[in-house]
């Protein structure tokens, strides 16, 4: 995106008719996010990637080489933006961009936490390169949540020097969600240093304030963190707005909070200019069925929002927050020509989409040619483990029965500590399918040290042998759960054979497999194939009686230290609130909790770490 300063003379000349436009959009109904009105009979003249003229008649800017687009009364609205999305999930940026722009979402603000968690600064730069020259534009933030808790976390992160380098790169706007607000309230030196670096660089810092209120929330905001996507109701949203924050109303694949937040805010007419929509991540199935930010706009209107107000929340408000209003967010002279032509203000379905004045979508179909940067070969070699066997999932005991501590799943995401009495056979504590007690294991797949912990999990409910995933927030351990050690090994090995992914094993065979070959978190397959793979993965487990609607999220969230109550990493089972390890065998010592080491370590590229 070229600075406006390089275009001002040309734009002024086109606006005056002294130079001819590259594109004129005629006969459109302009959705003005600045005045809240729809202006019929508008014409828009575009020069290069920016708008030069908006008004009733652009004929003075028409030349022999000007492309004329007759909108036939369609609504011209600014491209939508997703101000907080983790794009390092499921599909490549190229596949995501192609789908997003079909839904009128032309800007994505990427927080690549897992890519950095796997591969550090190299991963950050790689994802940036993969996001260039695509139908939608990408902006980036430096992950602000790694490590979530240095006492237990082993995730990669950026060094202070790398943070400073990153914010000097084009399209890097600042820092992503700062997960652990307790690190701010306790003035953790590393966290405060990183925040200071961002503030000194004039950067945006995004927030994550789940569970914070009162003086704790004030302390967090006082550090210059001015947005949050974690409010789940209007009361939480209002508390943050009153402290000067911006609120991103989340409507994505993991949580949908819009219906709880927006109606009371509309009734009060409070803080509407500081509300945005975000997904926080969206999977291919949801994208295909619901859409992207266009879905949020439809929902907002259904909940009572004026259509133009909803469009402003999806566009102008986002760029106001990111201090980019001079360039993006609305249709006016000087701004980038990210324009979508909507059939109506009910479906918000775009017929045509222009990004930087170039037509990316025509007649509802993608017409831009893509030449995406491919993931480098090292991204397919991030699993540094050898073949696993049933013995690698053993929990040893000399007794006939053992009392064990368990992770009880309340939802796909929420856990609590439980306990169970299990039988011991040939020195191995066994899971109990009858009692819905599973084994769960986390393996270090990145460093090559072979560390792992094996524990127990309750309330998964599916009649399967095992589920394995190389993608997990934000440690990216290889997480395996199952009712059979043999099938757990088979599922884990199936994932490793693909270079990463999610696998289900039933009755000794792999019944569903979603390859995630790029760093073990992103698929190199086309969007449609990934969507089909995720759908099959889900249906196989729900048809087998799984308790949850999105079973793949169970291993994804099991190591996630930003949420209570009990988590498992390769270093051990963790009580998040008490910040202490939990013994797998009740009453056993956890003093050092040194991770057990496998002998069959597969050597990989040192540069991954």
Swiss-Prot record:
Q: Per its UniProt entry, which superkingdom is the organism in?
A: Archaea
Q: Which Pfam families does this UniProt record tie to the protein?
A: Adenine_deam_C (PF13382), Amidohydro_1 (PF01979)
Keywords linked to the UniProt accession: Hydrolase, Manganese
Single GO molecular-function term?
adenine deaminase activity
**Catalysed reaction per UniProt?**
adenine + H2O + H(+) = hypoxanthine + NH4(+)
For activity, the cofactor(s) needed are: Mn(2+)
Query: Biological process GO annotation list?
Result: adenine catabolic process
- Report the HAMAP family cross-referenced here: Adenine_deamin
Q: What is the protein's name according to its record?
A: Adenine deaminase
Give me the gene this protein comes from: ade
């Amino acid at each position: 995106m070229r600075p406006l300063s390089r275009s001002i003379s040309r734009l002024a000349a086109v606006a005056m008719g002294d130079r001819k436009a590259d594109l004129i959009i005629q006969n459109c109904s302009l959705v003005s996010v600045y005045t809240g009105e729809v202006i019929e009979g508008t014409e828009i003249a575009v020069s290069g990637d920016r708008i030069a003229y908006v008004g009733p008649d652009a004929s003075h800017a028409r030349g022999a080489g000007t492309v004329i687009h007759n909108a036939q009364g369609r609504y011209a609205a600014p491209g939508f933006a997703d101000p907080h999305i983790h794009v390092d999930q499921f599909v490549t940026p190229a596949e995501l961009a192609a789908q997003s722009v079909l839904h009128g979402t032309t800007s994505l603000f990427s927080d690549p936490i897992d890519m950095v968690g796997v591969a550090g600064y190299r991963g950050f730069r790689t994802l940036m390169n993969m996001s260039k020259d695509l139908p939608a534009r990408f902006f980036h933030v430096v992950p602000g949540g790694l490590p979530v808790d240095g006492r237990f976390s082993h995730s990669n992160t950026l060094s202070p020097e790398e943070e400073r380098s990153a914010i000097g790169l084009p399209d890097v706007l600042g820092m992503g969600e700062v997960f652990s607000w307790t690190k701010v309230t306790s003035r953790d030196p590393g966290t405060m240093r990183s925040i200071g670096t961002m503030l000194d660089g004039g950067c945006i810092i995004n927030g994550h304030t789940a569970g914070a209120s009162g003086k704790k929330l004030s302390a967090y905001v006082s550090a210059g963190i001015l947005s949050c996507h974690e409010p789940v109701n209007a009361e939480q949203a209002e508390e943050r707005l009153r402290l000067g924050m911006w609120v991103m109303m989340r409507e994505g694949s993991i949580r949908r909070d819009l219906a709880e937040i927006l109606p009371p805010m509309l009734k009060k007419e409070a803080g509407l200019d500081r509300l945005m929509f975000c997904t926080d991540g969206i999977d291919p199935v949801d994208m295909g069925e619901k859409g992207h930010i266009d879905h949020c706009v439809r929902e907002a209107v259904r909940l009572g929002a004026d259509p133009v107000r909803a469009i402003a929340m999806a566009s102008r408000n986002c760029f106001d927050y990111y201090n980019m209003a001079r360039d993006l967010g609305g249709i006016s002279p000087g701004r980038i020509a990210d324009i979508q032509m909507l059939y109506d203000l009910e479906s918000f379905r775009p017929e045509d989409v222009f990004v930087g004045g170039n037509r990316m979508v025509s007649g509802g179909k993608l017409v831009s040619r893509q030449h995406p940067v491919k993931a480098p070969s090292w991204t397919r070699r991030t699993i540094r483990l050898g073949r696993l066997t049933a013995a690698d999932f053993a929990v040893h005991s000399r007794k006939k029965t053992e009392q064990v501590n368990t992770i009880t799943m309340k939802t796909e995401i929420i856990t609590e500590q439980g306990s169970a009495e299990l039988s011991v056979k040939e020195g191995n504590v066994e899971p109990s399918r009858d009692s819905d007690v599973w084994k769960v294991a986390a393996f270090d797949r990145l460093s090559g040290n072979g560390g792992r912990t094996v524990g127990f999990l309750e309330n998964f409910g599916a009649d399967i042998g095992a589920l394995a995933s190389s993608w997990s927030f934000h440690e990216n351990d290889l997480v395996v759960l199952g009712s059979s050690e043999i099938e757990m090994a088979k599922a884990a090995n199936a994932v490793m054979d693909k270079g990463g992914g999610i696998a289900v094993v039933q009755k000794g065979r792999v019944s569903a497999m979603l390859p995630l070959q790029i760093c073990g978190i992103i698929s190199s397959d086309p969007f449609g194939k990934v969507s089909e793979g995720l759908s099959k993965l889900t249906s196989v487990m729900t048809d087998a009686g799984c308790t949850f609607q999105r079973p793949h999220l169970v291993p994804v969230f099991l190591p996630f230290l930003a949420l209570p109550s009990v988590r498992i990493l390769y270093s051990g089972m963790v009580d998040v609130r008490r910040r202490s390890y939990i013994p797998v065998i009740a009453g056993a010592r956890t003093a050092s909790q040194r991770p057990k080491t496998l002998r069959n370590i597969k050597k990989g590229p040192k540069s991954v770490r």
